[in-house]
């Protein structure tokens, strides 16, 4: 009887392990096929060297292989060539570990996790090992907190590490920002997004190309909790979410947008799709919006299909383009403004 029970336990464990090793990261078949196609195109574009050698590792689980395929399919070419496959595999495993360990991990939809937790890159910073470092520092600080309180706590931690200082150099990496202890808004928001993702909280950097009220721009953070996106100033802790010094300027802004890693099919308006990212319009998180229908006609009164339409705001003594659309057959696509 003991032998039978032991065999039954071993069999059950084997089944569980088999199921875990064969669980999909990309659960939707049509999306999985699209990612596989984009990945093959990336491989064909980079046929030399051993840039994709990590995929030859027979020990990779289905989950790990698909997560790596997603990252490689849409990462910039420089990220393929500059960092080894083991680096990306470690980050895949860390993100999964965090999702399994954090109480909110199971609440995050797969699509949200895929685009706003797994990706390492936020802006044009150098990539580093911040996910592991930040997780080790933050896991006990957010332990037992509801998700929204955890977001606030992470931002308090970020404020302890980095303060604002203007600069014009390339965006510093998250660990470099900790070392210098300062950064401009784009660096503070890159750092904060990395910290939130390190503890499994979906986050994205939001940017307004130009303000309507003053000659400047700004970047901050949105984090996902309980089915909604909330905004706040990076390294600028407040007692609640959706509160920052920029509430009023953002309510008058012409555009707030973010670049999402990979092919993204979320509810927001898609402004631009590239081989690496999807640019989306998040203005409605800050102000009432409406559709502006622009018609372009030739001298005969006929619609000019494909005509380029630029939406501009006056800033720095010039009309600055914040969004570009083109005339389509189905309808003249509108840009959402407040």
Predicted regions and their residues:
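Extracellular ectodomain segments of secreted/surface proteins
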Residues: 266-293
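A short, amphipathic beta-strand motif
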Residues: 290-298, 330
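Hydrophobic/aromatic-rich core segments of domains that either
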Residues: 140-141, 145, 150-156, 165-175, ...
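Single conserved hydrophobic/aromatic residue that forms the stacking wall/gate
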Residues: 331-338
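Secondary-structure boundary elements
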Residues: 27-30, 37-180, 215-216
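Bacterial N-terminal signal peptides that target proteins for export
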Residues: 1-8
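C-terminal motif of bacterial Sec signal peptides marking the signal peptidase cleavage site
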Residues: 18-19
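Short amphipathic beta-strand segments in non-cytosolic proteins
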Residues: 307-323
């Amino acid at each position: 009887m003991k032998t039978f029970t032991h065999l039954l336990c071993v069999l059950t464990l084997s089944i569980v392990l088999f199921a875990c090793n064969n669980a999909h990261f990309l659960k939707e078949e049509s999306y999985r096929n699209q990612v596989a196609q984009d990945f093959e195109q990336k491989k064909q574009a980079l046929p030399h060297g051993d840039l994709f050698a990590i995929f030859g590792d027979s020990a990779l689980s289905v989950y790990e292989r698909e997560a790596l395929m997603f990252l490689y399919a849409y990462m910039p070419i420089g990220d393929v060539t500059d960092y080894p496959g083991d680096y990306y595999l470690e980050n895949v495993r860390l993100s999964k570990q965090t999702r399994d360990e954090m109480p909110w991990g199971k609440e995050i939809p797969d699509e949200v996790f895929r685009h706003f937790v797994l990706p390492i890159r936020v802006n044009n910073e150098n990539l580093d090992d911040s996910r592991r470092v930040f997780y080790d520092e933050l896991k006990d600080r957010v332990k037992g907190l509801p998700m929204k309180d955890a977001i606030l706590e992470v931002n308090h931690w970020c404020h302890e590490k980095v303060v604002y200082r203007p600069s014009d150099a390339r965006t510093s990496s998250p660990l470099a920002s900790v070392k210098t202890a300062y950064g401009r808004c784009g660096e503070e928001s890159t750092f904060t997004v990395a910290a939130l993702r390190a503890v499994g909280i979906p986050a994205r950097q939001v940017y307004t190309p130009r303000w309507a009220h003053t000659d400047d721009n700004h970047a901050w953070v949105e984090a996902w909790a309980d089915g909604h996106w909330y905004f706040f100033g990076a390294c600028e802790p407040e007692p609640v979410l959706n509160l920052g010094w920029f509430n009023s300027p953002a309510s008058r802004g012409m555009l707030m947008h973010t670049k999402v890693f990979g092919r993204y099919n979320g509810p927001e308006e898609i402004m631009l799709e590239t081989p690496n990212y999807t640019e989306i319009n998040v203005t409605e998180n800050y102000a009432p919006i409406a559709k502006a229908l622009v018609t372009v006609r030739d001298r005969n009164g006929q619609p000019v299909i494909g005509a380029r339409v630029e939406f501009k705001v006056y800033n720095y003594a010039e009309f600055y383009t914040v969004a570009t659309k083109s005339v389509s057959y189905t309808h003249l696509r509108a840009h959402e403004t407040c």
